[in-house]
Amino acid sequence: MRRKFPILESERVVLRQFVDSDLENVFKGLSHPDIIHYYGISFDSLDATKEQMKWFADLEKNETGIWWAVCSKDDGRFLGAGGLNNLSKENKKGEIGFWLLPENWGKGFMTESMPLVFNYGFNSIGLHRIEGFVETENENCKKALARLKFNLEGTMRDCEIKNNAFISLDIYAKIVVK
């Protein structure tokens, strides 16, 4: 029997399961130049964005991760998305990812919502380690992870190709303290 999808809350945000009506907001985010500049995926149509919605659902179904729609607690407005993927039960680790619509940047929503995600990973899933892979040039994301007490472990130089050029990724990690 499947567990009920967890709803996570803080003072200003609610993290909930994606619903079909989120499609337009996910498309808005994953087609926005300021988001996709550092994000690994982008879409050019609502129809193509359905692939991402399926990915969100498949993560949970296949127990390889869980992503939430990040929403305003006040009015339910969609702010962005965040979650865990690439879960390894054997190694008790996962990868954190997140993005916010640009109009929500600089308002503390990410700093408020991401502890809900990693605490869920540590306390409910039983993870020992949560990793974040960040393009070396993405200063805003690196600052956000540092504020959340993720430690920079190193840089994988020229490890991926994006737009026909090699990019480097910084590896950040947070390890559960027991």
Question: How would you describe each model-predicted region?
Answer:
Residues 1-33, 67, 71-178:
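Acyl-donor (CoA/ACP) binding surface of acyl/acetyltransferases
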Residues 11, 48, 60-61, 92:
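Intrinsically disordered, low-complexity regions enriched in Ser/Pro/Gly/Gln/His and often acidic
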Residues 34-55, 66:
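Conserved GNAT-fold acetyl-CoA-binding loop/helix
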Residues 55-59, 120:
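A generic secondary-structure signal
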Residues 58-64, 150:
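Short loop/turn motifs at secondary-structure junctions and domain boundaries
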